[in-house]
Regions:
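Charge-dense, helix-prone N-terminal extensions
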Residues: 1-145
């Protein structure tokens, strides 16, 4: 028996999740050069709300200087940074993306953050001070070792 279509407010994907999936499908169709990919990341950052935009700009600058081996690209419509194999290592999700109260710096399974049998992969960001920036640099260095 075929599953019934989900209607109304029942279980299923949110409007924001569907938009992210459409963005990912577009990204797979249009794999452009490195300059175009970075331009697309910068356009995504420019479209963010001011507090998240400032943090995303700073995260982008940190990653470009501290992890130049990571290539900027978009991933599900978010700024992301991929290794030489094209695997996303980390990404920046603005608060508006999924209507959360904080932005997120997230790491994928390609990041080498393993620490025992359990470790964090997403970090909430409300503000970036020098302490958070130092933590980000340390995490990215671990993730790319």
């Amino acid at each position: 028996m075929a599953p019934k279509a989900v209607q109304g407010n029942g279980p299923g994907f949110t409007k924001e999740e569907k938009a992210a999936m459409r963005a990912a499908a577009r990204e797979r169709k249009v794999r452009s050069g490195a300059q175009d990919a970075e331009r697309e990341v910068l356009e995504k950052i420019a479209g963010m709300d001011p507090p998240d935009r400032r943090m995303a700009e700073r995260v982008h600058a940190l990653l470009r200087s501290e992890a130049p081996q990571l290539a900027p690209r978009t991933w599900y419509g978010m700024p992301a940074y991929a290794n030489a194999e094209g695997e996303v290592v980390c990404f920046f999700r603005d608060a508006r993306k999924f209507k959360t109260r904080y932005a997120t710096l997230g790491f994928s399974d390609a990041a080498k953050l393993d620490d025992g049998k359990m470790w964090p992969t997403d970090f909430a960001l409300l503000e970036l001070t020098s302490a958070e920036e130092a933590r980000i640099v340390e995490l990215v260095r671990r993730a790319t070792r």
